Amino acid sequence: MDSDPAFTQLAIAKGVPWYVEFFQRFDRLFTFGANIGTQASDIPVGAFTWHKTWQPITLDDWRAAPAPGGPSTSLGPGRFSTVMTWQIESFTDVGGNKDIEFVKFIDLPSQTRQPFELAINGPQKLLREHGWETVDAMKVSRTPWEYREFIHRSKAEFGVAKHTYVANHTGWFSDRTECYLASGRPALVQDTGWTAHLPSGEGLLAFSNPDEAVAGIERINADYDRHARSAAEIAREHFDASRLLPRLLEISCS
């Protein structure tokens, strides 16, 4: 299961023997990059066939009480949040980490009254200087229950993607975002090409630049309850394990 589309394929394309041999051991390969191996992305796949999938979610484990911030008539105290890594330690020869994209949106807190909270292992001082509230990512993700609690106390997700996902139009969609949606939390996330495969506009919104991000925040806050309901419905329709696993097994056993 490839959760880092483009990074994985680009590393294979470099032809490092042990890495290529590792993937040759498998009968079927799956990826979270919905555009990998299609004309929508120029990432090379070589002799490998990658099957598109989303991360299966057990919805009962993510049901939550209404989000902080109350009804959609006001901003309320709830925060748009995410859990993120500024730069990954793997694939250092590929590059294209999240920091490259995030700096494009670093002044977002000054463009909206909406509060933000980042759980991040990155330059917290720099981010706080630009108006982001920050906590240590490890502190909120040591256990599945702490991770879930952080998401449940959030109003919505604001998520930026790694530069490699965006630049190569991979169609990557985050399993973290799935958890927000399954919790009934709307998600405003950067477009990597996933909008060709998933609904966008209610509950799940895409952005590609700061103006679109601000507009998305305003749309969610203008009718929060509707977006929260739509978020949960998208999770049921597209990420429910009872729907995804049969197809995974069918492809794996074919």
Predicted feature descriptions by range:
Residues 222-252:
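A charged, aromatic-enriched C-terminal amphipathic alpha-helix characteristic of glycosyltransferases
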Residues 2-175, 179, 186, 190-201:
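Nucleotide-sugar donor-binding catalytic core of glycosyltransferases
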Residues 188, 198, 206, 210, ...:
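Conserved catalytic or regulatory cores that recognize and/or transform ribose-phosphate-containing ligands
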Residues 76, 205-226:
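C-terminal "capping" alpha-helix adjacent to the active site of nucleotide-linked donor transferases
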Residues 97-101, 139-142, 212, 223, ...:
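Soluble or luminal CAZymes and related metallo-dependent hydrolases
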